[in-house]
Amino acid sequence: MSLFKKDTSSEMVPTKTEMDVLQVLWQYGPSTVRFVHDKLNEQKEAVIYTSTLKLMQVMKEKGMLARDESSMKHVYSAVLQEEKVKGNMLGRFVDSMYNGSPSNLMMALLGNDKTSAEELEKIKELLKQVDSK
């Protein structure tokens, strides 16, 4: 049983490439295909423009994106809320990888060499905030 709240009525799990597009739109707001395409190319090896265009069209059909066609350049925006999508994905991850146990996830994170002293301090502060509630 997971401790994460899931919004199963609107639960949609984007693919890795769909998440890449959503991340750009969440970070920069409504954008043209060209802008999203350029940002994706900054993040990884060359992506073909027509592939980005087709992906965003499919995401619109799935209800993940909205398209403003009022000007010559179509502007896309994310319909899915970042917090909900990431919460759903995190819940699924914890369920499948850590038997629904957030504490098992935290133990794995804290035992990881990638966790810096600064990040550990942030975690301690978060735990203090949770304890004081």
Which residues does each PLM region occupy?
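Glycine-centered, phosphate/nucleic-acid-interacting loop/turn motifs that mediate DNA/RNA or nucleotide
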Residues: 63
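Short acidic, hydrophobic short linear motifs in intrinsically disordered regions
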Residues: 31-40
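Short, hydrophobic-biased segments on the C-terminal half of alpha helices
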Residues: 53-57
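Short, cationic-aromatic polyanion-contact patches
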Residues: 15, 70-89
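Short helix-coil junctions and helix-kink-helix linkers
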Residues: 39-47
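Short capping segments at the starts of secondary-structure elements
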Residues: 14, 24-32
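Pre-recognition alpha-helix immediately N-terminal to the DNA-recognition helix
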Residues: 19-23
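Amphipathic alpha-helical dimerization/coiled-coil segments
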Residues: 89-131
